[in-house]
């Protein structure tokens, strides 16, 4: 949807929702409405990181904004670089919380994996982020600015894809997450096509249905990790509230409502969920032409689990495909800097600043 969720569903303009402090300053000064659009275009479109870069504003207004409203709400403290080209960004919020973001280079693609919460309350037993607990939700600017900062860092290369698969459960911060994604999608903002943006959830059924009803064509991924109910409850506490039959009803609603492919994430844990009976049960559970299984070998965290061998993972993939499943085995990226899936925990938040 071009005009940002029909201007936040016919409410306030997206620029005002995204920049309420700026809107307040402009209103106090009696500035014309187009000033807010200029600021929004400069920060979200041109990626200005300071008020002195917003040349479209009068000098006096730039000076007042500089004294009252931060041009950026995140401080980039550290960039770590992996051998495979992956980059991990350590940011601090203005109230001192650490969050992490990852950029994954693949041929012609540059994918940014962003966070939506400080920590995560879901407590998935194999995920380092879940060990942190939850501090607070991120605001829309804090979510979107992760992408802006990465875009500035990798220029002249461009961010081609955004995945909401970093720290936190995005559907527990639904409003701010959707607002940030609309800024990223908005042609007056970051101008990234909706089909290049994907959100991952641990399986909040009511929000899956709500997401299916949104006008934008964002993609969705559901963290599944096992087809067996009791095992899923042990791995993912959320399963106690949203059992697999309920989850699959929501999944069916999503694909029938949107006619878009639905991705299921599956982390292979050695001796836990990597047996052939799991592949066979998955083939029965994911029996829909729009379902796709993304397999990923476990990335080390100090949670007591270990990774399925590469050979076993390939056998699992082959069996799943033999049974008719659309499935992919995704490579792990950035493991040597703890930037891979499930590893984000801001462990180096107290390390010296480095670039």
UniProtKB/Swiss-Prot annotation:
InterPro entries: Aldolase_TIM, Methyltransferase_A, RNA_MTrfase_RlmN, rRNA_lsu_MTrfase_RlmN/Cfr, rSAM. Disulfide bonds join 113-341. S-adenosyl-L-methionine binds at residues 168-169, 200, 223-225, 299. It is found in: Cytoplasm. GO terms for biological process: rRNA base methylation; tRNA methylation. Keywords: 4Fe-4S, Cytoplasm, Disulfide bond, Iron, Iron-sulfur, Metal-binding, Methyltransferase, rRNA processing, S-adenosyl-L-methionine, Transferase, tRNA processing. [4Fe-4S] cluster binds at residues 120, 124, 127. It is an enzyme of class 2 (transferase). Gene3D superfamilies: 1.10.150.530, Aldolase class I (3.20.20.70). It catalyses: adenosine(2503) in 23S rRNA + 2 reduced [2Fe-2S]-[ferredoxin] + 2 S-adenosyl-L-methionine = 2-methyladenosine(2503) in 23S rRNA + 5'-deoxyadenosine + L-methionine + 2 oxidized [2Fe-2S]-[ferredoxin] + S-adenosyl-L-homocysteine; adenosine(37) in tRNA + 2 reduced [2Fe-2S]-[ferredoxin] + 2 S-adenosyl-L-methionine = 2-methyladenosine(37) in tRNA + 5'-deoxyadenosine + L-methionine + 2 oxidized [2Fe-2S]-[ferredoxin] + S-adenosyl-L-homocysteine. The active site is at 100 (proton acceptor), 341 (s-methylcysteine intermediate). Reaction proceeds by a ping-pong mechanism involving intermediate methylation of a conserved cysteine residue. NCBIfam families: rRNA_mod_RlmN. Belongs to the radical SAM superfamily. RlmN family. Specifically methylates position 2 of adenine 2503 in 23S rRNA and position 2 of adenine 37 in tRNAs. This is Probable dual-specificity RNA methyltransferase RlmN. It comes from Rubrobacter xylanophilus (strain DSM 9941 / JCM 11954 / NBRC 16129 / PRD-1).
């Amino acid at each position: 949807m071009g005009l940002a969720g029909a201007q936040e569903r016919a409410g306030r303009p997206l620029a005002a929702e995204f920049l309420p402090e700026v809107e307040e300053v402009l209103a106090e000064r009696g500035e014309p409405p187009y000033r807010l659009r200029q600021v929004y275009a400069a920060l979200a479109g041109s990626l200005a990181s300071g008020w002195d870069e917003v040349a479209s504003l009068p000098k006096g207004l730039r000076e007042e904004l500089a004294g009252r409203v931060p041009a950026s709400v995140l401080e980039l403290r550290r960039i770590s670089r992996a051998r495979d080209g992956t980059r991990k960004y350590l940011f601090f919020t203005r109230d001192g919380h650490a969050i992490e973001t990852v950029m994954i280079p693949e041929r012609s693609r540059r994918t940014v994996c962003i966070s939506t919460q400080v920590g995560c309350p879901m407590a998935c037993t194999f995920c380092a982020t879940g060990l942190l607990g939850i501090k607070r939700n991120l605001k829309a600017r804090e979510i979107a600015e992760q992408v802006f900062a990465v875009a500035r860092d990798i220029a002249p290369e461009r961010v081609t894809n955004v995945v909401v698969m970093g720290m936190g459960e995005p559907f527990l911060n639904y409003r701010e997450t959707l607002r940030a994604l609309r800024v990223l999608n908005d042609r007056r903002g970051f101008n990234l096509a909706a089909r290049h943006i994907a959100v991952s959830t641990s399986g909040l059924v009511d929000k899956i249905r709500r997401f299916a009803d949104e006008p934008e064509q964002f993609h969705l991924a559901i963290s599944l990790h096992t087809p067996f109910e009791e095992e899923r409850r042990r791995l993912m506490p959320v399963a106690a509230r949203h059992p697999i039959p309920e989850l699959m009803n929501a999944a069916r609603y999503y694909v029938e409502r949107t006619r878009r492919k639905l991705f299921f994430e599956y982390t292979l844990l050695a001796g836990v969920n990597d047996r052939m009976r799991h592949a066979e049960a998955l083939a029965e559970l994911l029996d829909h032409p729009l379902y796709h299984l993304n397999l990923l070998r476990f990335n080390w965290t100090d949670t007591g689990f270990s990774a399925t061998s590469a050979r076993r993972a390939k056998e699992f993939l082959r069996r799943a495909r033999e049974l008719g499943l659309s499935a992919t085995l995704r490579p792990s990226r950035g493991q040597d800097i703890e930037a891979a899936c499930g590893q984000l925990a801001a462990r180096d938040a107290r390390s010296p600043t480095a670039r």
